[in-house]
């Protein structure tokens, strides 16, 4: 859902998304499947998984699958140290009555975790670190996996979102006139990334 705000797709079959319908845990295994499929078809294309820390925790053991099967995926991990979509639901639809969303000390250092699997990891904590991290990932993404851990604000919301009991046509935050356009400005990055 993070990528849905900015990405522009210009070819068919280049975007996998749960479309806000149960997104947590979808991105990383979907990226592995896309990379395995591309590899089987002889396509040398980069595959990028943009995921939150909560979704990644649901199947982070698949780092082993990625390495064992030589599937060089770029993992862009948005780390807000909580179950972000759950927190956002509780904020928007339940009067900010927060319950069981905070990782506390249970959120690992994902860079160290990636490195334990032999995957390069980079932590991005300031807006000025973004460009070099992306260049690093772009330079290796076809041959080696890499994890980019973006430290973001605890209360960063993700749009669009489907309200409780709703369906795709009821998504909130999809007004084409107000959605940000890529490339993202430095000011927009500074709003998202921690200082």
Where do the protein language model's features map onto the residues?
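Thiamine diphosphate
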Residues: 2-195
């Amino acid at each position: 859902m993070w990528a849905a705000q900015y990405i522009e797709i210009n070819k068919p079959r280049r975007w996998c998304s749960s479309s806000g319908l149960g997104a947590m845990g979808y991105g990383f295994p979907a990226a592995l499947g896309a990379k395995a499929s591309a590899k089987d078809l002889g396509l040398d294309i980069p595959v990028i998984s943009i995921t939150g820390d909560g979704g990644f925790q649901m199947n982070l053991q698949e780092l082993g699958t990625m390495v064992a099967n030589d599937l060089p995926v770029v993992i862009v991990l948005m780390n807000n140290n909580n179950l972000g979509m759950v927190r956002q639901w509780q904020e928007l639809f339940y009067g900010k009555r927060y319950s069981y969303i905070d990782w506390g000390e249970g959120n690992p250092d994902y860079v160290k975790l990636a490195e334990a699997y032999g995957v390069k990891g980079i932590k991005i904590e300031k807006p000025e670190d973004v460009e070099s991290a992306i260049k690093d990932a772009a330079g290796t993404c076809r041959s080696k996996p890499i994890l980019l851990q973006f430290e973001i604000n605890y209360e960063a919301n993700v749009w669009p979102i489907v309200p409780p009991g709703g369906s795709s046509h009821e998504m909130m935050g999809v007004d084409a006139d107000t959605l940000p356009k890529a490339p993202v400005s430095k000011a927009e990055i500074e709003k998202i990334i921690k200082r």
